[in-house]
């Protein structure tokens, strides 16, 4: 089964909610970019470069400085396996910009846990087809010839893929999407020196939504070995088929 065949939509809604359905009435969520927002120096990037453990800061304090949307407590356990994606319809009052988003799990006891993240420079928002194939829902070439201008006040369709994960979110927990325009300790964003305002469309025919690769609990998983994923004879990579 293709990952797109099992993507579940959660729509960004007024009141900082993530809802399984969207309203026919359009609304807007406004956010002024805070360039001091950060995931801290011990982020996924430090893990890649220096093999350090990921240690995020107080996610609730960070969320207070961002645009956030959260589900109601989940009625059932939900397994997310694959790459989540975010489809935003937005405008900015600047001629450049970026978005940095995190997906978090809010436990029933109030604790918040980091699940994954994604980021995109608006100029690279053109969605392309990967020449060598891509298992995820969204792919950008990041090549010069695919750059798109950013016009202040003009609506943009900004789709980005978050890093793939496999996790089980328990019934009673919630999911929170946190949207920022910067990550001070990890990213150099194009808007440093200015404070643009982002306006994200909620509802209507251009509704912004989070797409989650949710696994059907009634289907037994199958997998195949990915040939040549790693050198040597002792390392294997597997691709889940459903």
Identify the meaning behind each predicted range:
Residues 4-242:
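C-terminal, loop-rich substrate-recognition/catalytic regions characterized by aromatic stacking residues
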């Amino acid at each position: 089964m293709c990952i797109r065949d099992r993507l579940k939509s959660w729509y960004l809604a007024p009141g900082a909610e993530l809802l399984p359905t969207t309203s026919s009435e359009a609304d807007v969520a406004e956010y002024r970019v805070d360039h001091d927002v950060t995931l801290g120096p011990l982020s996924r990037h430090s893990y890649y470069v220096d093999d350090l453990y990921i240690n995020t800061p107080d996610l609730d304090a960070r969320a207070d400085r961002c645009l956030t949307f959260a589900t109601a407590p989940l009625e059932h356990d939900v397994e997310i396996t694959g790459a989540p994606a975010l489809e935003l319809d937005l405008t900015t009052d600047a001629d450049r910009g970026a978005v940095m988003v995190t997906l978090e799990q809010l436990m029933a006891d109030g604790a918040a846990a980091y699940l994954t993240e994604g980021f995109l420079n608006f100029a690279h928002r053109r969605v392309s087809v990967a020449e060598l194939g891509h298992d995820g829902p969204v792919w950008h070439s990041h090549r010069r010839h695919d750059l798109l201008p950013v016009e202040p006040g003009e609506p943009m369709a900004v789709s980005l893929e978050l890093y793939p994960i496999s996790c089980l979110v328990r019934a009673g927990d919630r999911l929170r999407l946190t949207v920022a325009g910067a990550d001070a300790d990890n990213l150099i964003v194009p808007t440093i020196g200015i404070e643009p305002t982002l306006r994200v469309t909620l509802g209507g025919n251009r509704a912004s939504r989070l797409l989650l690769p949710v696994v059907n609990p009634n289907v037994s998983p199958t997998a195949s070995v990915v040939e040549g994923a790693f050198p040597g004879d002792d390392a294997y990579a597997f691709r889940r088929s459903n």
